[in-house]
Design a protein with these regions (language model features):
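Motif-centric detector for short Cys/His coordination patterns
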Residues: 1-98
Length: 98
């Protein structure tokens, strides 16, 4: 991959949840908005957990440590929803209720 290609790769700089949507601001000035329901762990999280995120790899991905959730920016741009199976999500959700 050339250095010019790396400069054009999308990177996040800010993340927020508002009105049932995940909003990711990119360093190039774009903002991505997707339904929060695309990511069930985020949809079922408390507002505090939703705000507790860190950028990985200089902004190429977002990690929510309280939720064990990772979202890559390229996947978000491609319209990829959570790839977690229903069974895995149900196990995670039942573990939170204990």
């Amino acid at each position: 991959m050339t250095s010019s290609a790396l400069k054009n790769e999308p990177k996040a700089m800010n993340v927020r949840v508002h009105d049932g949507k995940l909003i990711v601001d990119l360093v190039d000035g774009r903002s991505l908005t997707v339904p929060l329901d695309w990511y069930p762990r985020l949809a079922h999280a408390t507002p505090e957990q939703q705000r507790n995120w860190v950028l990985l790899g200089d902004g190429y991905a977002i990690h929510w440590p309280d939720l064990d959730e990772d979202i890559g920016i390229e996947g978000l741009l491609a319209g990829n929803r959570s790839g977690e199976s229903r069974e895995s999500f149900e196990r995670w959700l039942s573990g939170r209720k204990k």
